[in-house]
Amino acid sequence: MDGQERKIIAPITGSIAKILVKNGQVVSKDEAVVFIEAMKMEYKLVALKSGKVIGLKNKKGDLIEKGETLLEIE
């Protein structure tokens, strides 16, 4: 399995608009996990594989940078 497939990475600089999961939660492939707000638009980030959410440290309203890892799925 490719390591990049495990990570949910911010595609753009912005802020966390919504977090739909928590650490330890099991998610399905293509399930929405986080929404980022940037340039007055919301961007939906989805799980690239099924598994358990780990490493979620952000909360709603946090500023994030493009390329930042938001969470991983194991």
Give the label of every model feature segment:
Residues 1-15, 32-48:
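Short beta-strand-turn/beta-hairpin segments enriched in glycine/proline and small hydrophobics
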Residues 11-12, 17-22, 26, 55-58:
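Short histidine-centered loop motifs in beta-beta connectors
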Residues 24-33, 61-70:
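A structural signal for short beta-strand/turn segments enriched in small hydrophobics and glycine
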Residues 73-74:
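Short C-terminal tail/terminal secondary-structure segment
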